[in-house]
């Protein structure tokens, strides 16, 4: 199998030569096909043919490791990003927002979901901003994902040893490929997109504008969630935890506000040593009324050892450096704790007591964790679901088909059905169109009754994919059923000839 051209090669294992090759049907857009090789082909992109972008960004995702990729020979870079929390409001000098060339270990980030999310890297230091062009949504300055991704071109030389950077044309091809990568539906969230009681409580706290938790903002004030953001201006609208801004949050460096679609993938580093940045696992046991403030503070952070939580699945967890084991513990970080005005600087307004150090406060944190593990992604939970209806399983399968129709009616997926080699696309209002163009639509109940003669497989596909998958495989304007009747090839636009 040769993925770059979606073909099959026949190899003479003795002569070690290719003796035949044929291309297969591939419905992907041309820009995806052209850009794929720059992610995976180590011979093309590295010095020794042993490294590629995919070595760390496995299948465009993560390797679950942290890397210290600072450049001691480099120079500081300007931070031109709009700030969700501005350090100057606290009396800090403007120049501390500069991106230093040494940055410490940071975990590999996913390349999925970069479209419509602005600057890249944990710090947002890969950016199209130049300090002159105004940064405006959706695609100007720091919010220009195309320019941000192209800023990685020097990494082909600096990280994987290529003699030269990619040409402008090749880097454009790679950019087009990379910005198509999309997060899958959240696998934990209910298929009907509903939330459990704990998840709903966490959701409500997250969006409650009165619940200030980070000095000046509620959760959604920084980690913006808006499924329709820039709709009509980009082909991948929506913010899912970040609108592309940078922030000062009493961290060691300035960071881009991170998106939150893949937190469930980072679960597995269990347990961490006590330190003065996070409350201990059980901060309440052993507190006595006669403790001094200093004694109580020491107890809250060091009063008990964090318990062993079993075998590790990953070596790195949450935050930019992967140092925090759970989302719950992250919400126990000192920056979210109550703080009096003037505690950090004379201009520090303090932090209200909305994540209190009480049993009730711990429950809020647990609920937030539950919600963040089922965070929205670009695709709804129903996308990708498939089920087969037969003559004998209607009682058990029927409710799932009902659910798929219900979610398709809401626009969450394109629902297709396959029966005896025929394709059907759900059009709403209980009606399917068939892959024979002149046929009248078939009622949903009538289609379902066809399962008495042969099984029907229903699939919720990503929005926009239904017509190709159900009706016109090669998108040449002639429906599949019509091509079969005419004896023509419904895959002809995407198939090659056998060559020897």
Predicted regions and their residues:
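C-terminal cell-surface addressing/anchoring modules of secreted/extracellular proteins
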Residues: 498-500
């Amino acid at each position: 199998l040769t993925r770059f051209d979606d073909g099959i090669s026949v190899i003479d294992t003795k002569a070690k030569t290719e003796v035949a090759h044929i291309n297969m049907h591939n419905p992907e857009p041309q820009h995806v096909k052209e850009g794929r090789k720059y992610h995976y082909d180590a011979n093309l992109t590295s010095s020794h043919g042993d490294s590629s972008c995919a070595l760390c960004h496995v299948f465009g995702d993560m390797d679950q490791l942290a890397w210290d990729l600072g450049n001691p020979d480099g120079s500081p870079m300007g931070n031109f990003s709009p700030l969700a929390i501005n350090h100057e409001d606290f009396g800090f000098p403007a120049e501390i927002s500069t991106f230093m060339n040494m940055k410490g270990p940071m975990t590999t980030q996913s390349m999925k979901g970069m479209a419509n999310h602005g600057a890249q890297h944990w710090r947002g230091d890969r950016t199209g901003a130049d300090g002159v062009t105004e940064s405006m949504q959706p695609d100007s300055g720091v919010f220009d994902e195309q320019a941000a991704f192209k800023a990685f071109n020097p990494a082909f030389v600096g990280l994987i040893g290529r003699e030269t950077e990619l040409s402008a044309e090749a880097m454009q091809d790679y950019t087009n490929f990379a910005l198509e990568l999309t997060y899958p539906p959240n696998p934990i969230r209910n298929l009907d997109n509903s939330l459990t009681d704990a998840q709903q409580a966490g959701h409500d706290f997250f969006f409650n504008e009165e619940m200030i938790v980070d000095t000046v903002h509620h959760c959604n004030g920084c980690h913006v969630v808006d499924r329709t953001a820039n709709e009509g201006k980009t082909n991948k609208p929506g913010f899912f935890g970040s609108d592309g801004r940078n922030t000062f949050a009493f961290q060691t460096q300035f960071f881009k506000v991170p998106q939150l679609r893949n937190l469930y993938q980072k679960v597995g580093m269990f347990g961490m040593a006590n330190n003065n940045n996070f409350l201990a696992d059980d901060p309440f046991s052993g507190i006595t009324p006669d403790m001094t403030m200093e004694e109580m503070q020491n107890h809250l952070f060091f009063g008990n050892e964090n318990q062993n939580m079993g075998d590790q699945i990953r070596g790195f967890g949450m935050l930019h450096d992967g140092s925090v084991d759970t989302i719950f513990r992250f919400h126990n970080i000192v920056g979210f704790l109550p703080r009096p005005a003037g505690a950090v600087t004379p201009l520090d307004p303090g932090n209200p007591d909305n994540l209190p150090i009480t049993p009730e406060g711990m429950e809020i944190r647990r609920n937030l964790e539950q919600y963040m593990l089922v965070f929205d992604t670009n695709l709804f939970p129903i996308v990708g679901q498939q089920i087969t209806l037969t003559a004998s399983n209607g009682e058990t399968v029927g409710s799932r088909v009902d659910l798929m129709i219900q979610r398709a009616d809401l626009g969450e997926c394109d629902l297709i059905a396959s029966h005896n080699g025929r394709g059907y696309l759900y059009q709403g209002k209980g009606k399917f169109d068939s892959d024979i163009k002149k046929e009248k639509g078939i009622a949903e109940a009538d289609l379902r009754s066809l399962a008495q003669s042969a099984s029907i497989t229903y699939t919720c596909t990503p929005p926009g994919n239904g017509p190709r998958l159900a009706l016109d495989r090669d998108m040449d304007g002639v429906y599949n059923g019509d091509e079969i009747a005419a004896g023509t090839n419904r895959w002809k636009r995407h198939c090659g000839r056998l060559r020897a």
